Amino acid sequence: MCELYSKRDTLGLRKKHIGPSCKVFFASDPIKIVRAQRQYMFDENGEQYLDCINNVAHVGHCHPGVVKAALKQMELLNTNSRFLHDNIVEYAKRLSATLPEKLSVCYFTNSGSEANDLALRLARQFRGHQDVITLDHAYHGHLSSLIEISPYKFQKGKDVKKEFVHVAPTPDTYRGKYREDHADSASAYADEVKKIIEDAHNSGRKIAAFIAESMQSCGGQIIPPAGYFQKVAEYVHGAGGVFIADEVQVGFGRVGKHFWSFQMYGEDFVPDIVTMGKPMGNGHPVACVVTTKEIAEAFSSSGMEYFNTYGGNPVSCAVGLAVLDIIENEDLQGNAKRVGNYLTELLKKQKAKHTLIGDIRGIGLFIGIDLVKDHLKRTPATAEAQHIIYKMKEKRVLLSADGPHRNVLKIKPPMCFTEEDAKFMVDQLDRILTVLEEAMGTKTESVTSENTPCKTKMLKEAHIELLRDSTTDSKENPSRKRNGMCTDTHSLLSKRLKT
């Protein structure tokens, strides 16, 4: 493949012309990706990387069915949605068929951020209320209206929480306020929302909506306890608000057993508004808000027309329809269940073996590995997590870390991920954890390595990295980027680009 620029020149041009707040993976040595296919990505040297984090290329990178559908429609027509066209109504019909009956009205947008912004508008118009309840560590998009309700973002900056925003504790039963040993963590976390509603009402405020990802992604791959959402919905509805389920990162069969993540909590839980995005177009910008007729009619009654220039255009809908076809025809939802179960079992064995692994949580191909320094205190192993993802990159496996402490390895690969891919990923992780734990002086079970000299070399390198970091001159800039371990998680690691 002919490239316009060398990697060095590409980096230079990026620094010159792209805003510095636009980050890339692996800051100290970014990968230049030139092509991709299925669950694999290739750099400018032809090196193949196993993609374990790209939940945008849902049915696989550059799937020929998606490419063909886009090309065919682009050759015929692509215009705005003010004209009648079959694609938009067919796509709306197909999407609605995957959802509970009451969710039947669609608004197409171009991104998850646009979808969540519109969801807030729908919720506020419905009853005329303004306040929003969100979860701690939540992220719902990059628009100003969404940064305001995303503690993941506004708590990191200088922004002050707006008075109409109320933050409820994340229903995290591993690291949160109410843990796995609590008698009824679902009720306890839901009661926190109930108290927020009561306090808001006592202050003369009214709740428009509660918004949450069906499984919190950026917050650390958190799966709420069973019954939590039902109780929250009851309290929110009682306050005249609506429940918004953000499925932007977790929908379209990723959990395996169900097409939508919110469905795994039971048939007695149905959100009032569902937003979706990322995987819808397999990389093509398409997103959607689906809601009830009642909420849609209230929005229309405002007299303000809703129009989105590109939302629901013929090409985007053709791509979206192709993605739905591929999920069904290739049984990718079933694959997510089978491979996800297999991967989870492999990781549970690693948890029993490695002291750094505190928790394995997930369902289908949505999995988090919570790394800790101390199992009793559950101290986040932030530096170790960053070290691991860089070492995995050297092994040609792409992982990333997230959560409030950046210590949770997140796994959200394309849905065509195989058992062979899962085993390869876990084998590399096992070797890296073994070397790292030995370098740290923590106990790990004995591991038979296929390449003892290589293991010895890695162990020496890990020792050197740890030594170098612990003896860094205090006068040096502690936030400089480095391709390895660090001792100051609030300086170096916080400066590292989000991966």
From Swiss-Prot:
It is an enzyme of class 4 (lyase). Transmembrane segments: none annotated. CDD domains: OAT_like. One of its GO terms (biological process) is phospholipid transfer to membrane. PROSITE patterns: AA_TRANSFER_CLASS_3 (PS00600). Residues 468-479 have a biased composition (Basic and acidic residues). Residues 468-499 are annotated as: Disordered. GO terms for cellular component: membrane; mitochondrial matrix. Keywords: Lyase, Mitochondrion, Pyridoxal phosphate. Disulfide bonds: none annotated. Catalyzes the pyridoxal-phosphate-dependent breakdown of phosphoethanolamine, converting it to ammonia, inorganic phosphate and acetaldehyde. It is found in: Mitochondrion. Gene3D superfamilies: Aspartate Aminotransferase, domain 1, Type I PLP-dependent aspartate aminotransferase-like (Major domain). Its EC number is 4.2.3.2. It holds the Pfam family Aminotran_3. GO terms for molecular function: ethanolamine-phosphate phospho-lyase activity; pyridoxal phosphate binding; transaminase activity. The modification N6-(pyridoxal phosphate)lysine is found at residue 278. Its main location: mitochondrion. Belongs to the class-III pyridoxal-phosphate-dependent aminotransferase family. It catalyses: phosphoethanolamine + H2O = acetaldehyde + NH4(+) + phosphate. This is Ethanolamine-phosphate phospho-lyase. Its cofactor is pyridoxal 5'-phosphate. The gene is ETNPPL. Homotetramer. It comes from Homo sapiens.
